[in-house]
Amino acid sequence: MLDSVASKPELAELLTLTKTEQILRLAQINVELEPLSAQERVKWALENLDGEFAVSSSFGIQAAVMLHLVTQEKPDIPIILTDTGYLFAETYRFIDELTEKLNLNLKVYRAEQSAQWQEARYGKLWEQGVEGIEKYNKINKVEPMRRALKELNVGTWFSGLRREQSKSRAGLPILSIQNGVFKFLPVIDWTNKDVHYYLEQHGLTYHPLWEEGYLSVGDTHTTRKWEPGMSEEETRFFGLKRECGLHEDDGNEQDGSGI
């Protein structure tokens, strides 16, 4: 079935095109990737897209799915974490647990200034409205991620975003180009039920805060526990934003939990 997917796309050539031209050029490949399983998509990407390869993970609620899925095919693939210094204690323990359980090749990137230095210089940016949140995300998520992609010489970036998670992700394709590299989303069409079954099947767990009512987990100061009547999007960034920037294509980027 993998052989039926269109021929290997050339990143260097695609980078000479406009964004619209890139989308059109990759459209047929995306059509042919849609009916494949997530495992088949990962295999196709590893065989046909530019390396080096890497996975970005926020080690959020469903992070174990993507980490397990890709490392089953490429055990030594770098796992990029952008650490803000404000993650939950449970998240740091979850990182340690999954790193040991899956033998992850974890690469941690941080902002050039410490969290304390940033607060001294700018105040609490996350309390300064959308503009403050975007500046915070640029410093703590976007810049470290771009540095990681460059230093690791990444040609293809795997991420666990899913269309079901938010309106901003609903129209995303499996394969695109972002920050000058291929962006590949093998579980983009998975439902929460698909995620649950995969975790059960492979003896994996949700983030520990799942049991306490969290649907999405990021920094302690911009993550809220889900309450009746709230959408998943409203549990992050006070409902002002869904994305932290890592997955937005205009240079401000989009993360949040992904997987």
UniProtKB/Swiss-Prot annotation:
Active site residues per record: C244
Q: Name one GO molecular function term.
A: phosphoadenylyl-sulfate reductase (thioredoxin) activity
InterPro entries given for it?
PAPS/APS_Rdtase, PAPS_reduct_dom, PAPS_reductase_CysH, Rossmann-like_a/b/a_fold
- For the keyword Cytoplasm, the answer is yes
Q: Which reaction does it catalyse?
A: [thioredoxin]-disulfide + sulfite + adenosine 3',5'-bisphosphate + 2 H(+) = [thioredoxin]-dithiol + 3'-phosphoadenylyl sulfate
Pfam families of this UniProt entry?
PAPS_reduct (PF01507)
**GO biological process: any one?**
sulfate assimilation, phosphoadenylyl sulfate reduction by phosphoadenylyl-sulfate reductase (thioredoxin)
Question: Pathway, per Swiss-Prot/TrEMBL?
Answer: Sulfur metabolism; hydrogen sulfide biosynthesis; sulfite from sulfate: step 3/3
Localisation per UniProt entry: Cytoplasm
Q: What is its EC number?
A: 1.8.4.8
Q: Which cellular component terms (GO) are annotated to the entry? A: cytoplasm
Q: Which UniProt keywords apply?
A: Cytoplasm, Oxidoreductase
According to the lineage, what is the superkingdom?
Bacteria
The record's annotation in Gene3D superfamilies points to: HUPs
Name the protein family.
Belongs to the PAPS reductase family. CysH subfamily.
Function as written in the Swiss-Prot or TrEMBL entry: Catalyzes the formation of sulfite from phosphoadenosine 5'-phosphosulfate (PAPS) using thioredoxin as an electron donor.
- Return the protein name: Phosphoadenosine 5'-phosphosulfate reductase
Species of the source = Vibrio parahaemolyticus serotype O3:K6 (strain RIMD 2210633)
The taxonomic lineage of its organism, from the top, reads:
Bacteria, Pseudomonadati, Pseudomonadota, Gammaproteobacteria, Vibrionales
